[in-house]
Each structure stands twice: as structure tokens, then as C-alpha cells.
């Protein structure tokens, strides 16, 4: 187990999460007693208690007052916020995880972008107008792409779509930083934003779903072509 945390709390958190992931503390079992676990990890009980509370909020654990702390099946109890952690823990599954992420984006974006163009075309146009000022480099496009999808999600009138994108931000933008290093990706994105802007102007909301799905297909093809050179630290946080 290689842990890169910089603080005792960070070390304890990574230790427990990796132990759950590697079945040292399997789902459905109980954690060792607080005193034993703090000695095992090498942190104070106060620090451990804070870490356990945080992991419980994220769905990894269930703290039962007066009873031992239970390890959850995190796939059933956690939210989108653990995607980055899962990607870091299981490098071999990262390509499939990202494929699933992009598929989800296309499927829900087809719905909320259509709603934005139909119900709030002026707001959608304002979001898409940002694309006319973007610098032709990876970080700029990465930020723009996230802001456009998130902005259109909120412009749909259903804030739940926006909250979903908030939850996806970490992994989404790390993948995007690599994806938009390809000039073809940036060119395709600009064409997509321009088509959406035209559909907004023409109020042709009935064509939005096909537009989004075609973009998902074309961008997915570019992504597949880039997987062979995907950096091993793609899902690691910048330090």
C-alpha cells in the first residue's frame, strides 16, 4: 500500500479507504475498535474520529452510536464525489470508468440541453457565447467545456442536472485536460458549440438531441484513439 498523504488525517483517510477497496476491511464487516485502529494507523483517536465522520458522510462507513462502525458497500451508499478516488485506486479500470462517464454525459446532456434551448434559449445563448473568446489551448478548452455543459444544465430549468455536473467536476476536468490536448478535440468542440448556438437562435430544439448524440459519438471516437497514450497519472490531483 503506497500512501501519498501529507497530513495524519489524510494518511488515515487513505489507509482506511484503500483497506476497504482491497478487502482488508470488506463491505458488511465492522471496523476495528477506535483504540486499536488508531494504533494500527499511527494517529491520535481525535484525528481518527474526525476521519471516520468524514468517511461516513461520503458513504464509505456507517457510524452506529453505541455499536461498532460498519463498512458499507460504497457503490450503493456513496455519491459522485468518490469517482476520483475510485479512479485513483483502480488504474486498470480507468478507461472503462471514463467511457461510462462520457456515456452518462451524452445521455443526460441530450435531455437538459434540449430543455435549455426550448425553455430558456436566451440563457443558453449566453452560456454558448463564451466559446467565441476561448484561447486555443488545452486548459482553456477544458474549463470552457465544463462551464458550457454545467451552464446549460442549469439553464434547463432543472437544477438537479447542474448538481450532477458539480459532482462530476473533479474527474471530468482531469480527463478533459488530456482530451483537449488534441487539436482535433478542440476543433470538434467549437463546431459543436456553434451548432448548438445556431439551434438556439433558430429555436430548433427538436434537433438538439441528435446534435448532442452525434457529438458524443464523434468525441468518443477521438477519445478511443487517445487511450493508447493516456498518461498513468491522469486521475491524480495536480500538486
Curated annotation (Swiss-Prot):
SUPFAM superfamilies: GntR ligand-binding domain-like, Winged helix' DNA-binding domain. InterPro entries: FA-response_TF_FadR, FadR_C, TF_FadR/GntR_C, Tscrpt_reg_HTH_GntR, WH-like_DNA-bd_sf, WH_DNA-bd_sf. Residues 34-53 bind DNA. GO terms for molecular function: DNA binding; DNA-binding transcription factor activity; fatty-acyl-CoA binding. It is found in: Cytoplasm. Residues 6-74 form the HTH gntR-type domain. Gene3D superfamilies: GntR ligand-binding domain-like, Winged helix-like DNA-binding domain superfamily/Winged helix DNA-binding domain. SMART domains: HTH_GNTR. CDD domains: WHTH_GntR. Keywords: Activator, Cytoplasm, DNA-binding, Fatty acid metabolism, Lipid metabolism, Repressor, Transcription, Transcription regulation. The keyword Thylakoid does not apply. GO terms for cellular component: cytoplasm. It comes from the Bacteria. It holds the Pfam family GntR. GO terms for biological process: fatty acid metabolic process; regulation of fatty acid metabolic process. The keyword Repressor applies. Homodimer. Multifunctional regulator of fatty acid metabolism. NCBIfam families: fadR_gamma, PRK04984.1. This is Fatty acid metabolism regulator protein. The lineage of its organism: Bacteria, Pseudomonadati, Pseudomonadota, Gammaproteobacteria, Enterobacterales.
Amino acid at each position: 500500500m503506497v500512501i501519498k498523504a501529507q497530513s495524519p488525517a489524510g494518511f488515515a483517510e487513505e489507509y482506511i479507504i484503500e483497506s476497504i477497496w482491497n478487502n482488508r476491511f470488506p463491505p458488511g464487516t465492522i471496523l476495528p475498535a477506535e483504540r486499536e485502529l488508531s494504533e494500527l494507523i499511527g494517529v491520535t483517536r481525535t484525528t481518527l474520529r474526525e476521519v471516520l465522520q468524514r468517511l461516513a458522510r461520503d458513504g464509505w462507513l456507517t457510524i452506529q452510536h453505541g455499536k461498532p462502525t460498519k463498512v458499507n458497500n460504497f457503490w450503493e451508499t456513496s455519491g459522485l464525489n468518490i469517482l476520483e478516488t475510485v479512479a485513483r485506486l483502480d488504474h486498470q479500470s480507468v478507461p472503462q470508468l471514463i467511457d461510462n462517464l462520457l456515456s452518462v454525459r451524452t445521455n443526460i446532456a441530450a435531455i437538459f440541453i434540449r430543455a435549455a434551448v426550448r425553455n430558456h434559449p436566451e440563457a443558453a445563448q449566453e452560456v454558448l457565447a463564451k466559446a467565441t473568446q476561448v484561447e486555443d489551448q488545452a486548459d482553456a478548452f477544458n474549463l470552457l467545456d465544463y462551464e458550457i455543459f454545467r451552464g446549460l444544465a442549469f439553464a434547463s430549468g432543472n437544477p438537479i442536472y447542474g448538481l450532477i455536473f458539480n459532482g462530476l467536476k473533479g474527474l471530468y476536468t482531469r480527463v478533459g485536460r488530456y482530451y483537449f490536448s488534441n487539436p482535433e478535440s478542440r476543433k470538434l468542440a467549437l463546431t459543436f458549440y456553434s451548432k448548438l448556438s445556431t439551434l438556439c437562435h433558430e429555436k430548433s430544439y427538436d434537433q438538439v438531441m441528435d446534435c448532442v448524440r452525434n457529438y458524443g459519438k464523434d468525441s468518443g471516437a477521438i477519445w478511443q484513439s487517445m487511450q493508447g497514450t493516456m498518461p498513468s497519472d491522469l486521475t491524480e490531483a495536480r500538486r
